[in-house]
Amino acid sequence: MRRFLFILLTCLAMTTSVVAVNRVHGYVRAENGDLMPYVDVSIPAENWYTLTDTLGGYEVLTDKDSVWVEFSHVGYKTERKFFTFSDKKRSDRRMDLFLREDTQNLADVNVQGGRLQHTMSQALDITKLEVMPTASVGGIESLVKTFQGVSSNNELSTQYSVRGGSYDENSVYVNGIEVYRPYLVRTGEQEGLSFVNPDLAGNVQFSAGGFDAKYGDKLSSVLEITYRKPYRFEAGVGGSFMGATAYIGSSNEKYSQIHGFRYKNASWLLGTLQTSGEYDPNFLDYQTYITYKPHEKVELAFLANLSQNTYNFKPQTRSTIFGTMGDLQNFTVYFSGKEQDRFRTAFGALSAVYKPTDRWKLGLTVSAFYTDERISYDIEGEYWLNKVYSVDGMMGEQTGVGNYYEHARNQMNSLVIKAAHDGSVKLTENNTLSWGVDFTQEMVDETIGEWEMRDSSGYSVPYQSTNPSLYYSLQSSNHLNEYRIRGYVQDEYRWHLRKGGIMSFNAGVRFNYWSFNNEVTVSPRLVIAYFPDIKPDIRFRFATGLYYQSPGYKEIKDTVTIDGQLTTYLNKDIKSQRSLQFIAGMDYYYNFLRHPFKLSVEVYYKHLNNINPYAVDNMKITYMGRNDAHGYAAGLDVKLFGEMVPGVDSWLGFSLMRTMESVIGTDNKYVPRPTDQLYNVSLFFQDYIPGLPQYRVHVLFNWAQGLPVRAPGAMQSSSNLRTPDYRRVDLGISRVFEKGKDPWMGRGFFKPFRQILVAFEVLNLFGFNNVNSYYWVSTIASDAQYAVPNYLTGRQFNLKLQFKF
């Protein structure tokens, strides 16, 4: 495999056209000399933009021989600079400039896209992923989990909960195309790599609610990634104890390409779990993004992904001590058997964009997603449950003994084909109308065959004196072949108020029709933003709307018992879950001890109807398959972003949240939803050694309330048990070597490299035993069930290397 990747990268490098890339860089200051962070820097002719960093620094790369660069900020006059370059060699220009306050003509202020947060989306700086210590292989989701309102109690998974929503309530878009994840994944160990490849990503936006009408039919969040077009030849390789990555890209005036490879093997990390055995998880992924401009008004693009995830596991032993100091128990298991899982996915999208004028933009996209998933296991375990009389582990009397046998043969094939059109027209300088419509065909074939037998002291559980029965058995076969028609229209308008400031409105409506249940939903949405001229360092926003989540395949499965056998059928009476949302927020930019900071605060309330109740076991979500509940979610999210030490970004997030539901038949009693967490604190802190700023320390901290738990067979309303608080600290130490700063980088073996990153990480620094779920042990001697905790990963070390050409 390594030889194959090397040959492929070499061939691609030899066949690409390398063009000279010109660079303009410098700092932006106010008239009083203060550095200005978050200034919009754009090339209007190329629809390219960025922001100055927290020190006011910027960098512009272009392959053109001349370019206009625009600098703009609310409350300041827009500056436009023209640069010309030699077409024979690369040029490097330094340009520092000052922005003047604009006290009269606010029309010069350029407010576009998400640069000034007039929507509910926030930009993510994906460069932090290179140094952020995480248990994943550089997934963008690791960065998302540090945002306010986002929670994840499993470092092995890329899934997250946003403001009390389930893992299935989050949309992910790549270049405007919605992407999907495997259906049958039950644990974080199986999950592997997410779809998004950070090496290919350019602009990343995340919204925790109140998003525009153009985004799909989910209730909680939107993660939007735009894959970039390289300006020049570029390449990079990286590796760690948990995997490897590689990418290569190039471009010329009409053509651009970028390819990415990822490999992950988490056996190094899974070895810290309490169940010892032979872990062999292998995850491989290839992606490409290619663009071609046959005409200055037309651009074609192709996005593709191929991935294969295999998870092979042969458990051997497990020993877990749990309980309180007055009632310690030891759960010991000896295993035989194995698990073999395979997930294969393929995705392709071909799009065309036509811009007849500067005001009009028309797009057409055809895409397809295919997944082939297999889960197979036969695992037998013999267990003993003993009292523990001391923390040293001295065993006492035996409280339970038995064995169990778990069997599964589950498979699923799914094909999703979509044709979509979108467009926009700039009616005036301050008014843009956009729209879109798509037709989606969904085909799913699923066969489930799984059962579990338990034997306690020679008796099957549940105990029956005459006919021994299985503890759990599910057999089903379902087929789905339906279509969806969806569309939206929205208008974005802004104007300059007479008394100063800018007001921005984004009003739209979205509709959805699904042939499976013949349901039509209409979703009106509104986002308002205000940028006061009197106080330009404060910005306000408000969003409201009626949001629907059209059921997915997992949500329409209703479980019933027929002749003592559990099975599932597809419930055609299912309706979309509905959420009426109100969100208000503000951003405050300020300097403290000459360091720039940004404070963001949002409060929200979501009234939930037609809830489809569900239960969570590890990462597996099982829906009731009926709209049998109503509820609410309310909370406060706070994030402080800035330089706690000069020149290095850090941020602190804090959330208070409560989400409750009332299920039909429970006397209108409200109980916590499966993702209810009262508090969640996250911190990403960076520092460096005084006098040696190139040596940096990175700390990722998370502390969240435990999730509600219920025993198998218990009503959801009786749930009063929670997992312990989730606590985790990951530590990283890094050193970046750069050409031009480190003299030896331009010599010998290191001459081809532009940058080298070396990082050492300690994952789960303090060795916290975080509980992911519980295994419930039943005994014949008593009716009690023992909740044996399933712990997540322990302390582990990791070394990362990254080379950029």
Question: Where do the protein language model's features map onto the residues?
Answer:
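Periplasm-facing N-terminal accessory domains of Gram-negative outer-membrane beta-barrel systems
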Residues: V19-D108
